[in-house]
């Protein structure tokens, strides 16, 4: 019962399996460290992160290998070389059986065998056992991490002492360090968010949204994909519940107040398959930061979408960029005032439709400096828009309606795709080229689309009833003040940082074909009717009048702007534009106004009057 004595002649017991020995003590150390790790997190909650377990265990394993190697080297240097192995073998065998079947695996089991280890060293050849422990720890890491190629075969009892031990230790440390570095490089961003699928909001109890906690991971993928966005639900899950390649994301934007009235820090992801994910961050800074990072990976130049844009191949963009609700987009061709913007005789004409289905056509690029100089020389737009007695009767809302449609950089309801193609026509050489268009998704607002180093950027412009322009955190008295500011100051991009982008030139919108018009010194007739082609989406513009003039009649009030005037001058007549603004365009989607049946003439003393269209009529399909 007390084991064999040194003088006994009994047959030697079989040597226990070294793998079982390693696994036993590894489990004991792991259980002990796990309990202490959990206790440490409870005492220090600041370290309680989703990847805390991985970081702590890696650091523990690295230090374990270093301390283990040094301790084995120290013990082997001081231990005696003459030890009797047979009693030690019997004692260790009984100890292993007792620890396996009788007791729980804890640190006490390890301390129980301290007295036995000194007698075991010669029989077990601890110089080789160090290699076994290293190999066992490496196998445990292989089960948790990605598989790595095996470095060699199982060590034998006849191998050399020091060189294999040091070689295996160095190789294991180097392999784990390189793997960790590669993983950190592949991860672009990681954070804890809440998300829901847009379709799940109505399926919940009472129609409430089903929010879930997740760990969102933006990483560089393999096998051809540039980046992937992965949702880990729950956050500590080892495998993602949803994995989306960024090439399949067609839209990333912050939510509107009407979409999420009770949530301020949310943004939307729209995927090609029709799925929509709404994600919530803890503050506005994280929201804009996530949107900027995702857009930076999907943005033109970083994906197939922008490669097509930069090469002016618009066909590949139809499935990636949000398109206008009007498939057959046609716009009315508005005549643009000459650069001098001098008030001359005006002619009211019938609307002329223009279709811009081929964006690859050659359009003029006009320096913005020329427009601003002309604007300053003419004394501003208020005089040119309010000449005559009738202009004095306009309220501020009516004045705001006259500010966009009259100018060549405004392209109306040009779609997002075609606007991007226009500004990217010259590639990076057209840095700073811009157009202003009506927003497709937000009625009543406009979008500034510009070329940023060969990439198309879209900046939202909000206009109020007084003509004031709001761009992100900046307020301007008018759109022209905004153009002046961004002509000399860089545009603040959502991605932050210093952006060297100023507005340099604009794409001049196409005008209608030249019309013969009435002869000089002849008063221009006022049309009494409007003709609207069926199924056509257009702006109201002015061409040669085809309806006979009507007698003076009582027009509408000053706010309705239904009256129009004309005057005889000695200079050739110039087409004038009707009132058009983002606000009036948005209202037209709900109220389709009927054309006025008549018009009023201006008093004779108004020599330089400016005729305006009766009403704007739109139809959205």
Curated annotation (Swiss-Prot):
- Low complexity composition-biased segments: 552-570
- Any Pfam family hit: PH
Keywords assigned by UniProt?
Answer: Cytoplasm, Membrane, Phosphoprotein, SH2 domain
One GO biological process this protein is involved in is: insulin receptor signaling pathway
Name the source's superkingdom: Eukaryota
Q: Signal peptide span per the entry? A: none
Q: Name one GO molecular function term.
A: identical protein binding
The Phosphoserine modification is found at 130, 303, 597
Consequence when changing residue 437 to A: Abolishes interaction with phosphorylated INSR
Residue span of region Disordered = 144-165, 507-528, 548-609
Q: Where does this protein chiefly localize?
A: cytoplasm
Database matches in PROSITE patterns: PH_DOMAIN, SH2
* Tissue occurrence: Detected in embryonic brain, spinal cord and cortical neurons.
Q: Where in the cell is it found?
A: Cytoplasm; Membrane
Describe the location of the PH domain by residue ranges: 186-299
Q: Where is the SH2 domain?
A: 409-507
Q: In the UniProt record, does the keyword Ligase occur?
A: no
Positions bearing Phosphotyrosine: 47, 618
* UniProt record similarity statement: Belongs to the SH2B adapter family.
Q: What interactions and quaternary structure are annotated?
A: Homodimer. Interacts with KIT/c-KIT, SHC1, EPOR, PDGFR, VAV1 and VAV3. Interacts (via N-terminal region) with SHC1. Interacts (via the phosphorylated C-terminus) with GRB2. Interacts (via its SH2 domain) with EPOR, INSR and KIT. Interacts with GRB2 after B-cell antigen receptor stimulation. Interacts (via PH domain) with VAV3. Interacts with NTRK1, NTRK2 and NTRK3 (phosphorylated); after stimulation of the receptor by its extracellular ligand and subsequent autophosphorylation of the receptor. Binds INSR, GRB2, ASB6 and CAP. Insulin stimulation leads to dissociation of CAP.
Q: PANTHER family under this entry?
A: SH2B ADAPTER PROTEIN (PTHR10872), SH2B ADAPTER PROTEIN 2 (PTHR10872:SF4)
Q: Its function? A: Adapter protein for several members of the tyrosine kinase receptor family. Involved in multiple signaling pathways. Binds to EPOR and suppresses EPO-induced STAT5 activation, possibly through a masking effect on STAT5 docking sites in EPOR. Suppresses PDGF-induced mitogenesis. Involved in stimulation of glucose uptake by insulin. Involved in coupling from immunoreceptor to Ras signaling. Acts as a negative regulator of cytokine signaling in collaboration with CBL. Induces cytoskeletal reorganization and neurite outgrowth in cultured neurons.
Protein name, per record:
SH2B adapter protein 2
What gene name is given for the protein in this entry?
A: Sh2b2
């Amino acid at each position: 019962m007390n084991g064999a004595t040194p003088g006994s002649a009994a047959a030697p017991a079989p040597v226990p399996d070294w793998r079982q020995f390693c696994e036993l003590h590894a489990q004991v150390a792991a259980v002990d460290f796990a309990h202490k790790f959990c206790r440490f997190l409870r005492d220090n909650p600041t370290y309680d992160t989703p990847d805390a377990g991985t970081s702590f265990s890696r650091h523990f394993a690295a230090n374990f290998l270093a301390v283990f190697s040094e301790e084995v080297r120290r013990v082997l240097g001081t231990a005696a070389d003459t030890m009797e192995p047979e009693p030690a073998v019997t004692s260790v065998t009984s100890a292993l059986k007792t620890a396996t079947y009788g007791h729980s695996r804890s640190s006490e089991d390890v301390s129980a065998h301290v007295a036995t280890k000194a007698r075991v060293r010669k029989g077990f050849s601890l110089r080789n056992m160090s290699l076994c422990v290293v190999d066992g720890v490496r196998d445990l890491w292989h089960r948790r991490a990605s598989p790595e190629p095996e470095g060699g075969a199982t060590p034998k009892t006849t191998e050399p002492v020091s060189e294999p031990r040091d070689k295996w230790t160095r190789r294991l440390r180097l392999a784990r360090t390189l793997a960790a570095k590669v993983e950190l490089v592949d991860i672009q961003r990681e954070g804890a968010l809440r998300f829901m699928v847009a379709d799940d909001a109505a399926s919940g109890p009472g129609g409430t949204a089903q929010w879930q906690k997740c760990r969102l991971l933006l990483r560089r993928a393999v096998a051809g994909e540039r980046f992937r966005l992965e949702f880990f639900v729950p956050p500590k899950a080892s495998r993602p519940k949803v994995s989306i390649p960024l090439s399949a994301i067609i839209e990333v934007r912050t939510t509107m107040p009407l979409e999420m009235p009770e949530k301020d820090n949310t943004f939307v992801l729209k995927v090609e398959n029709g799925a929509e994910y709404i994600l919530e961050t803890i503050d506005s800074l994280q929201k804009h930061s996530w949107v900027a990072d995702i857009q930076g990976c999907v943005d033109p130049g970083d994906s197939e979408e922008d490669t097509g844009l930069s090469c002016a191949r618009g066909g590949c963009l139809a499935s990636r960029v949000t398109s206008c609700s009007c498939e057959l987009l046609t716009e009315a061709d508005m005549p643009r005032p000459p650069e001098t913007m001098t008030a001359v005789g005006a002619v009211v004409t019938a609307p002329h439709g223009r279709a811009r289905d081929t964006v690859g056509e050659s359009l003029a690029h006009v320096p913005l400096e020329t427009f601003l100089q002309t604007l300053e020389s003419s004394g501003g737009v208020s005089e040119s828009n309010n000449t005559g007695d009738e202009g004095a009767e306009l309220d501020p809302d009516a004045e705001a309606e006259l500010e966009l449609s009259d100018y060549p950089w405004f392209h109306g309801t040009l779609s997002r795709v075609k606007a991007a193609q226009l500004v990217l026509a010259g590639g990076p050489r057209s840095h700073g080229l811009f157009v202003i268009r009506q927003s497709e998704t937000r009625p009543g607002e406009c979008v500034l689309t510009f070329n940023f180093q060969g990439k198309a950027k879209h900046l939202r412009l909000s206009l109020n009833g007084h003509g004031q322009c709001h761009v992100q955190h900046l307020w301007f008295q008018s759109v022209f003040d905004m153009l002046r500011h961004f002509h000399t100051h860089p545009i603040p991009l959502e991605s932050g940082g210093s952006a060297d982008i100023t507005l340099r030139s604009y794409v001049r919108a196409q005008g209608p074909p030249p019309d013969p018009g009435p002869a000089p010194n002849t008063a221009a007739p006022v049309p009494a009717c409007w003709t609207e082609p069926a199924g056509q989406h257009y702006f109201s513009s002015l061409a040669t009048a085809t309806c006979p003039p009507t007698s003076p009649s009582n027009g509408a009030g000053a706010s309705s702007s239904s009256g129009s005037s004309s005057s005889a001058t000695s200079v050739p007549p110039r087409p004038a534009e009707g009132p058009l603004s983002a606000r009036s365009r948005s209202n037209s989607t709900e109220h389709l106004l009927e054309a006025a049946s008549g018009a009023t003439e201006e008093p004779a003393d108004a020599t330089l009057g400016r005729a305006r269209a009766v009403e704007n009529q739109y139809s959205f399909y």
